[in-house]
A protein has these predicted regions:
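N-terminal capping/lid subdomain adjacent to the active-site entrance of alpha/beta enzymes
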Residues: 1-184, 188-193, 197, 201-204, ...
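Catalytic beta/alpha-barrel core
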Residues: 156-163, 184-189, 206-216, 232-240, ...
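Shared catalytic-loop signature of beta/alpha-barrel
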Residues: 217-234, 239-335
Length: 367
């Protein structure tokens, strides 16, 4: 039975700045939801940033939504499934919902002595690990960084791009490392459909895909772009639910989908999107949001499902953090092992949690 919900706040430094088309991150402000039960606790990580630049959600907004609207819905017998149904009338706020759902799911699976991977239907014990490379200061730095990641064993490289920093980046990486490496690009919605002729130059480089080239609400633009270029179009920010995924596929706005649980409201919805894509033969992969070990563990369970046929952004902990909040995930022969113990399979290290503060405790009403 659920007894209380706690909010935990803290921060963690990144080992190096991570620059995208919408800004540069040097650290992460963190929000964890801790679901307290009779015998176990569950943890969920919020993926929202401190500013509403990736999406309209941001960390302080999530704190308020969780505290004012989501927690009061909970009862002692609440489950992740019942919470999703109860929270449905609240529009949007997917990252807030996903944060609470993850904690509830971790708790109930620990009570049931089932791993998240088994619950979701995973059929892999390890997943291929890709790495996301932020925009660098110059091409020499880019070549150095990509070379270091390939030496560490990453099986796929994703380059962040933006107008004025795109074609030459890809050309340089292909020239330096050859056509054999798996390579894709991510625009984070930095272009418009008027850039189609420019983006068509990417066709020469045999990319796996171009991720979210246009604004998230421009499905018509993505349809037109997909008709004009040969590089497969993958949607990220545009996909916020099963319905938006179905709509994008019906319109042929994309041929690949990046599934991020935090962006779609949680792991239950992410599983539905996976199942839809699997039924249609559409490849999916699991994106990253600079998660610590709490979110990374859960993402590994999701990425172990059969439809995840492309390497995702689930990198080793050391890619982002000198020391993670949980025991670190490591890359071995290009893969990361999927946790197979109960729940998400990891817990915060006590010495790391000591740097965090429990900022709120909400007792859950009895039925």
């Amino acid at each position: 039975m659920l007894r209380a919900i706690e909010l935990w706040r803290g921060g963690i430094e990144l080992v190096s700045p991570f620059r995208t088309s919408f800004g540069t991150d040097t650290s992460r402000d963190l929000l964890y939801v801790r679901a307290v039960g009779d015998a176990n606790v569950g943890w969920g990580e919020c993926v929202a940033g401190t500013e509403p630049n990736y999406s309209s959600e941001y960390l302080e907004n999530c704190v308020e939504v969780i505290s004012r609207f989501l927690v009061p819905m909970l009862r002692a017998d609440s489950t992740a499934q019942s919470f999703v149904a109860d929270a449905a009338p609240i529009r949007g706020n997917y990252m807030s919902k996903a944060n609470v759902e993850a904690a509830l799911l971790d708790l109930q699976l620990r009570d049931q002595k089932i791993s998240l991977a088994k619950f979701l239907g995973a059929n892999k014990t390890k997943v291929p690990s890709g790495v996301s490379v932020g925009i660098q200061n110059n091409l020499n730095d880019l070549v150095r960084v990509v070379g270091e990641y390939l030496a560490q064993g990453y099986v796929r490289v994703k380059l962040k791009i933006e107008p004025g920093s795109d074609i030459e980046l890809v050309r340089t990486v292909r020239k330096e490392f050859g056509d054999e490496i798996l390579l894709q690009v991510d625009a984070n919605a930095a272009y418009t459909v008027a850039d189609a002729k420019h983006l068509k130059q990417l066709d020469a480089f045999n990319l796996l895909l171009i991720e979210q080239p246009l604004p998230e609400d421009d499905l018509a633009g993505h349809v037109e772009l997909a008709r004009q270029i040969n590089t497969p179009v993958c949607l990220d920010e545009s996909i916020t639910s099963l319905d938006t995924a179905r709509g994008a596929l019906d319109l042929e706005a994309c041929s690949v989908i990046n599934i991020k649980p935090g962006r779609v409201g949680g792991y239950l919805e992410a599983k539905k999107i996976h199942d839809l894509c699997l039924s249609r033969g559409v490849p999916v992969w699991c994106g990253g949001m600079l998660e610590t070990g709490i979110g990374r563990a859960a993402n590994l369970a999701l990425a172990a499902l059969p439809g995840f046929t492309l390497p995702g952004d689930i990198s080793a902990s050391a890619r982002y953090f000198a020391r993670d909040i949980t025991p670190p995930f490591v890359i071995e022969s290009g893969h990361i092992s999927v946790p197979n113990t109960v729940g998400i399979g990891v817990e915060p290290l006590p010495e790391m949690l000591a740097n965090f503060k429990r900022t709120a405790v909400f007792e859950v009403a009895k039925n």
